[in-house]
């Protein structure tokens, strides 16, 4: 049972891992394609904005009339102080912007004209201090095209610990597990506390002794009683008359051999019998 459950869980985890890797690779591919498309669109937009900016500069330089001031070269104006003043062109008044015309081709340089007739002497001029326009009324230059995206910044500091999340919902009740094996017998428990004293009983009724009834029927035969103790020996009886002579009995069995006796003393030497003498030795 457990082996089947573990195998099923392992197989499911393997398939989930494979699916996760596949979708991660697909997502990275889509993000790369999206990044390339965004970069192409930004380059197209940059080209359009650069072209528009060039056309605006050409229109401004072509439509704004040039004003010459003879005294400007000899009179020193006030210096610009601060960063609020811009270096844009002088403002034009009552000059509506016309529609942009098509850019023509460059013509050939013309021949230098003849020298003009000397003019009359002019009136002595006064020293004029040229005031710059009020910085608050300075012309706002149009914003340039957006630059390319900068490199990713460094990793920021670790944020504060967020608040604790809400407590999760109560899970469903699990299935009842199989009945376990019977455990070993535990040690005897300690004696319980004495129970409370019972309530007093109700008062009994006064009994009235009735008349004796008729004797009942004879009961069944009871089981045999236990064996009694042996009785006391009786007194010896009177001596009886002698009996008749009995016949001889059968011979008894042979008894066992007795223990060996002590060895006797050596007897005296007997006399020589009629033996011949032995011949002498030859060798």
Curated annotation (Swiss-Prot):
<keyword id="KW-0677">Repeat</keyword>
<dbReference type="InterPro" id="IPR008160">
    <property type="entry name" value="Collagen"/>
</dbReference>
<keyword id="KW-0732">Signal</keyword>
<feature type="region of interest" description="Disordered">
    <location>
        <begin position="90"/>
        <end position="283"/>
    </location>
</feature>
<feature type="compositionally biased region" description="Pro residues">
    <location>
        <begin position="143"/>
        <end position="155"/>
    </location>
</feature>
<feature type="compositionally biased region" description="Low complexity">
    <location>
        <begin position="185"/>
        <end position="204"/>
    </location>
</feature>
<dbReference type="InterPro" id="IPR002486">
    <property type="entry name" value="Col_cuticle_N"/>
</dbReference>
<feature type="signal peptide">
    <location>
        <begin position="1"/>
        <end position="19"/>
    </location>
</feature>
<comment type="similarity">
    <text>Belongs to the cuticular collagen family.</text>
</comment>
<feature type="domain" description="Collagen-like">
    <location>
        <begin position="213"/>
        <end position="271"/>
    </location>
</feature>
<dbReference type="GO" id="GO:0042302">
    <property type="term" value="F:structural constituent of cuticle"/>
</dbReference>
<dbReference type="Pfam" id="PF01484">
    <property type="entry name" value="Col_cuticle_N"/>
</dbReference>
<dbReference type="Pfam" id="PF01391">
    <property type="entry name" value="Collagen"/>
</dbReference>
<comment type="function">
    <text>Probable cuticular collagen-like protein. Nematode cuticles are composed largely of collagen-like proteins. The cuticle functions both as an exoskeleton and as a barrier to protect the worm from its environment. Acts downstream of the Wnt signaling pathway, perhaps in the formation of the adult cuticle.</text>
</comment>
<comment type="subunit">
    <text>Collagen polypeptide chains are complexed within the cuticle by disulfide bonds and other types of covalent cross-links.</text>
</comment>
<feature type="compositionally biased region" description="Basic and acidic residues">
    <location>
        <begin position="127"/>
        <end position="139"/>
    </location>
</feature>
<dbReference type="GO" id="GO:0040002">
    <property type="term" value="P:collagen and cuticulin-based cuticle development"/>
</dbReference>
<keyword id="KW-1015">Disulfide bond</keyword>
<feature type="compositionally biased region" description="Basic and acidic residues">
    <location>
        <begin position="244"/>
        <end position="257"/>
    </location>
</feature>
<protein>
    <recommendedName>
        <fullName>Cuticle collagen 49</fullName>
    </recommendedName>
</protein>
């Amino acid at each position: 049972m457990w082996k089947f459950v573990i195998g099923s869980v392992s197989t499911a985890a393997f398939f989930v891992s494979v699916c996760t890797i596949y979708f991660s690779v697909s997502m990275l591919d889509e993000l790369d394609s999206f990044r390339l498309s965004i970069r192409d669109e930004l380059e197209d937009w940059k080209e359009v904005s650069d072209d528009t900016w060039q056309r605006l500069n050409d229109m401004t330089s072509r439509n704004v009339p040039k004003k010459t001031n003879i005294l400007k070269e000899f009179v020193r104006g006030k210096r610009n102080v601060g960063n609020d003043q811009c270096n844009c062109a002088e403002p034009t008044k009552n000059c509506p912007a016309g529609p942009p015309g098509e850019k023509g081709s460059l013509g050939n340089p013309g021949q230098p004209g003849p020298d003009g007739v000397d003019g009359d002497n002019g009136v002595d001029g006064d020293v004029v201090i040229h005031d710059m326009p009020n910085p608050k009324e300075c012309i706002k230059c149009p914003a340039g095209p957006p630059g390319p995206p900068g490199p990713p910044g460094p990793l920021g500091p670790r944020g504060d610990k967020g608040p604790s999340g809400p407590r999760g919902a109560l899970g469903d009740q699990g299935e009842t597990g199989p009945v376990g094996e019977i455990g070993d017998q535990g040690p005897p428990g300690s004696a319980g506390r004495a129970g409370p004293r019972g309530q007093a009983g109700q008062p009994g009724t006064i009994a009235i002794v009735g008349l004796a009834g008729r004797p009942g029927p004879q009961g069944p035969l009871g089981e045999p009683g236990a064996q009694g103790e042996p009785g006391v020996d009786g007194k010896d009886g009177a001596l009886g008359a002698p009996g008749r002579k009995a016949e001889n009995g059968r011979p008894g069995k042979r008894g066992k051999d007795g223990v060996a006796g002590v060895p006797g003393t050596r007897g005296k030497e007997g006399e020589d019998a009629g033996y011949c003498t032995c011949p002498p030795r030859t060798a």
